[in-house]
Curated annotation (Swiss-Prot):
Localization: Nucleus
InterPro entries (alphabetical): HD, HD_metazoa, Homeobox_CS, Homeodomain-like_sf, HXA1/B1/D1
Ranges in coiled-coil conformation: none
Record's protein name: Homeobox protein Hox-B1
Matches recorded under CDD domains: homeodomain
UniProt source species: Macaca mulatta (Rhesus macaque)
Family label: Belongs to the Antp homeobox family. Labial subfamily.
Keywords of the record: Developmental protein, DNA-binding, Homeobox, Nucleus, Transcription, Transcription regulation
Cytoplasm listed as a keyword: no
Biased composition (Polar residues): 58-67, 287-304
Designated gene of the protein: HOXB1
Lineage, highest ranks first: Eukaryota, Metazoa, Chordata, Craniata, Vertebrata
Location (main, coarse): nucleus
SMART domains named among the record's database cross-references: HOX (SM00389)
GO molecular function, one term: DNA-binding transcription activator activity, RNA polymerase II-specific
DNA-binding residue intervals: 206-265
Length: 304
């Protein structure tokens, strides 16, 4: 008896079924799945008298790496064998079921075993592909993704970003777009055009136009300039209230009057002689339509 042949998984028949029972070539060539209509011929249990009735055609026997149907462990009876008469019939034992480590073309002493989980995807496909007459429910490991859960999860966000970039943003409908609201401060112009409206005599315009002084206002301003070239704020407020002007108008008139006096001193070097009874400053102010007053006149006196 050849024990090496008996112990080899690729050559040893299950339950003395014969040389053609499970003569598988290699477990690596197992296909992933078979349609239910791919099974052709089925071995009969009654005709050959061997265990494995309802098993599929040699297409499954040659591609499967180990038996696909677990023998019932409760039945410990021997089955009739069609092997040569020189061998005693062997009983089916639960130890030959597909739930253990199986040798791959080696003897027991070599220790060449492989775990069934390495072919989880192929075995799961075989169990789903065969019908009621094919492989029954066995202790097959669950299917696993080829790359693992970690790598599959890592691919998801990367491809999600690419898909989001390819998608174009939907165009908003025109009726739903809100109209731009115009506030009151938007309507006010920064630099409004100046109008040529002439202000009333003695009243300053808010737009900063030229102020037309009356003769009475010019006379009182010239009197004050004769005594004081520079005014304090209290005196400026008093003169503005007396002449019905604002404080800014009085301040600007005194600034212009000082610049005019300095210009005349630079150009002529001397001023023309003043008429008797009038100070020298009054002679240069003839163009300003100012009248001469006596030196004894009080600056605060107002003429009617």
């Amino acid at each position: 008896m050849d024990y090496n042949r008996m112990n080899s998984f690729l050559e040893y028949p299950l339950c003395n079924r014969g040389p053609s029972a499970y003569s598988a070539h290699s477990a690596h060539s197992a296909p992933t799945s078979f349609p239910p209509s791919s099974t052709q011929a089925v071995d009969s249990y009654a005709s050959e008298g061997r265990y494995g009735g309802g098993l599929s055609s040699p297409a499954f026997q040659q591609n499967s790496g180990y038996p696909a149907q677990q023998p019932p462990s409760a039945l410990g009876v021997p089955f009739p064998s069609s092997a040569p008469s020189g061998y005693a019939p062997a009983a089916c034992s639960p130890s030959y079921g597909p739930s253990q480590y199986y040798p791959l073309g080696q003897s027991e002493g070599d220790g060449g075993y492989f775990h069934p989980t390495s072919y989880g995807a192929q075995l799961g496909g075989l169990s789903d592909g065969y019908g009621a007459g094919g492989a029954g429910p066995g202790p097959y490991p669950p299917q696993h993704p080829p790359y693992g859960n970690e790598q599959t999860a890592s691919f998801a966000p990367a491809y999600a970003d690419l898909l989001s970039e390819d998608k174009e943003a939907p165009c908003p409908s025109e009726p739903n777009t809100p109209t731009a609201r115009t506030f009151d401060w938007m309507k006010v112009k920064r630099n409004p055009p100046k109008t040529g409206k002439v202000s009333e005599p003695g009243l300053g315009s808010p737009s900063g136009l030229r102020t037309n002084f009356t003769t009475r206002q010019l006379t009182e301003l010239e009197k004050e300039f004769h005594f004081n070239k520079y005014l304090s704020r209290a005196r400026r407020v008093e003169i503005a209230a007396t002449l019905e002007l604002n404080e800014t108008q009085v301040k600007i008139w005194f600034q212009n009057r000082r610049m005019k006096q300095k210009k005349r001193e630079r150009e002529g070097g001397r001023v023309p002689p003043a008429p008797p009874g009038c100070p020298k400053e009054a002679a240069g102010d003839a163009s300003d339509q100012s009248t001469c007053t006596s030196p004894e006149a009080s600056p605060s006196s107002v003429t009617s």
